[in-house]
UniProtKB/Swiss-Prot annotation:
Coiled-coil residue windows: none
Gene it is expressed from: rpmC
GO BP terms, alphabetized: translation
GO cellular component, one term: cytosolic large ribosomal subunit
Name of the protein in question: Large ribosomal subunit protein uL29
Taxonomic source organism: Prochlorococcus marinus (strain MIT 9215)
A molecular-function term among this protein's GO annotations: structural constituent of ribosome
Family from the record: Belongs to the universal ribosomal protein uL29 family.
Keywords: Ribonucleoprotein, Ribosomal protein
Annotated SUPFAM superfamilies: Ribosomal protein L29 (L29p)
Cited PANTHER family: 60S RIBOSOMAL PROTEIN L35/50S RIBOSOMAL PROTEIN L29 (PTHR10916), LARGE RIBOSOMAL SUBUNIT PROTEIN UL29C (PTHR10916:SF0)
InterPro entries in UniProt: Ribosomal_protein_uL29 (IPR050063), Ribosomal_uL29 (IPR001854), Ribosomal_uL29_sf (IPR036049)
Key word Transmembrane helix present: no
Length: 72
């Protein structure tokens, strides 16, 4: 259920907000990798969640840009 809720929230964002969210999630992913390398990470499931959210946001971003291109 939580994933579908986050997808609904992502669809409400504009292109600038999507870009900011992608940057933030990529930073979080970097931090997780760093913690894993230093053996401080206990919640390894977050990798999958963040990667999925980045993919969803990239898909939304591309679909929004495609719809803007066709409408122009």
């Amino acid at each position: 259920m939580k994933n579908s809720e986050s997808l609904k929230e992502f669809k409400k964002l504009n292109s600038d907000q999507i870009t900011e969210k992608i940057d933030q999630l990529r930073k979080d992913l970097f931090d997780l990798r760093f913690k894993q390398a230093t053996r401080q990470l206990n919640e390894t499931h977050k990798f999958k969640i963040i990667k999925k959210q980045v993919a969803q946001l990239l898909t939304l971003s591309k679909s929004q840009s495609a719809s803007q291109t066709t409408s122009d």
